[in-house]
């Protein structure tokens, strides 16, 4: 096994076994983990407290039963899966769970949490251009920090926060480099492997993830770039799961050369910048800089233009919209984006994503037909 294969295998194992990753961290440090609900949270606070931030993004292919009691049928599958798992006690080992509430279903779920872990809820301001929005979010972060300190029994110092911010900024920068390398080496980093590298960072200390990805990049770049005889796409949406869906991309030689997925590249899009103000203020300012996301209000609707630019920069053949079933914010963005794609002559395909689905024949047929048309 080559070193590239070994690193990818390690990251895939972490991505597929989050509970083991959490248990290993507990055994190593004596501290626990804090759940991080979609989409954005001040993970740096959890890291600064010495606890492991654990992403909570549902499950793949799990049958929903108990969750139907608490959520309507038109709640997205990520929230349905999370509700199902927490009804089964899957998250009870977490020391706390942090909720941001940018959509109606997240608001609902934060109030219906059935697990034993304490829930910490905060709100991102949506009128993001105002300085008042920054001050509001600082106040929200101060409340999150105070609740974390109370629940975890620790003190989160500014020095610890600054250190965590630097670690997270480095991880985001390394992952942005990984995106470019993966685009150049689709024979090495296929759709499944690319997703695993992103997903593993949800269940690892960022400094350890950074070290592995740095080594992975160096090993890959030591080999020559080979011509790609398949198609290249940019993917946008909340997430691209289950893995059976990614297998279809591999089957038809569809390389993901860039993405705008909430679970993946949106997490690394914006750094916490240096400057005046304390760490909480600068973390709040990062939200003001966020762009191209359906959960971050943008009256100018720049997401479509951003995606078109990505296709130009990467030489992609098309855009694939991975539409999360019953996700209102994503559905509201799609008509605007689609019109812009058509006006610019950019080919696109919309596929419906549902974590509960077990049959992929329809998506397989649509992707096959789309590839043949490109």
Swiss-Prot record:
Enzyme class: lyase
Keyword hit for rRNA-binding: no
GO terms, molecular function: 4 iron, 4 sulfur cluster binding; lactoyl-CoA dehydratase activity; metal ion binding
Annotated catalysed reactions: (R)-lactoyl-CoA = acryloyl-CoA + H2O; (2R)-hydroxybutanoyl-CoA = (2E)-butenoyl-CoA + H2O
Record carries keyword 4Fe-4S: yes
EC number: 4.2.1.54
Matches recorded under Pfam families: HGD-D (PF06050)
Cofactor note: Binds 1 [4Fe-4S] cluster.
Cofactor: [4Fe-4S] cluster; FMN; riboflavin; Mg(2+)
Domain of life, source organism: Bacteria
Regulation of catalytic or functional activity: Activated by the LcdC protein.
InterPro entries in the cross-refs: FldB/FldC_alpha/beta
Keywords assigned by UniProt, alphabetized: 4Fe-4S, Flavoprotein, FMN, Iron, Iron-sulfur, Lyase, Metal-binding
Entry similarity comment: Belongs to the FldB/FldC dehydratase alpha/beta subunit family.
Reported function: Involved in the acrylate pathway for the conversion of D-lactic acid to propionic acid. Catalyzes the reversible dehydration of Lactoyl-CoA and 2-hydroxybutyroyl-CoA to acryloyl-CoA and crotonyl-CoA, respectively.
Note: The elimination of water from 2-hydroxybutyryl-CoA or lactoyl-CoA occurs in a syn mode.
Quaternary organization: Heterodimer of an alpha (LcdA) and a beta (LcdB) subunit.
Protein name: Lactoyl-CoA dehydratase subunit beta
Gene designation per UniProt: lcdB
């Amino acid at each position: 096994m080559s070193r590239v294969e070994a690193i990818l295998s390690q990251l895939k194992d972490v991505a597929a076994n989050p509970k083991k990753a959490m248990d290993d961290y507990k055994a190593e440090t004596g501290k626990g983990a804090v759940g991080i609900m979609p989409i954005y949270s001040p993970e740096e606070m959890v890291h600064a407290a010495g606890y492991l931030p654990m992403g909570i993004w549902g499950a793949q292919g799990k049958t929903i039963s108990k969750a139907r009691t608490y959520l309507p049928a038109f709640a997205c599958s990520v929230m349905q899966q999370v509700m199902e798992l927490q009804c089964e006690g899957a998250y009870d080992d977490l020391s706390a769970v942090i909720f941001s509430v940018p959509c109606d279903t997240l608001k609902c779920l934060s109030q219906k949490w059935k697990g034993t872990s304490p829930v910490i809820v905060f709100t991102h301001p949506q009128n993001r251009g105002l300085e008042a929005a920054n001050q509001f979010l600082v106040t929200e972060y101060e409340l999150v920090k105070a609740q974390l300190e109370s629940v975890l029994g620790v003190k989160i110092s500014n020095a610890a926060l600054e250190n965590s911010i630097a670690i997270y900024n480095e991880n985001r920068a390394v992952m942005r480099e990984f995106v470019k390398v993966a685009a150049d080496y689709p024979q090495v980093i296929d759709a499944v492997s690319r997703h695993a590298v992103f997903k593993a960072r949800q269940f690892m200390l960022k400094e350890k993830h950074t070290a592995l990805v740095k080594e992975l990049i160096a090993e890959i770049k030591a080999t020559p770039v080979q011509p790609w005889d398949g198609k290249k796409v940019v993917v946008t949406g909340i997430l691209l799961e289950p893995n059976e869906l990614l297998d279809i991309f591999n089957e038809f030689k569809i390389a993901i050369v860039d993405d705008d997925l909430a679970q993946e590249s949106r997490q690394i899009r914006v750094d916490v910048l240096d400057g005046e103000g304390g760490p909480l203020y600068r973390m709040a300012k990062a939200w003001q800089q966020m762009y191209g996301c359906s959960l971050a209000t943008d009256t100018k609707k720049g997401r479509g233009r951003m995606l078109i630019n990505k296709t130009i920069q990467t030489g992609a053949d098309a855009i694939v919209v991975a539409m999360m079933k019953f996700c209102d914010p994503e559905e509201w963005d799609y008509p605007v984006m689609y019109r812009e794609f058509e006006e610019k002559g950019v080919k696109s395909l919309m596929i419906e994503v549902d974590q509960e689905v077990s049959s992929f024949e329809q998506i397989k047929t649509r992707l096959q037909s789309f590839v043949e048309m490109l």
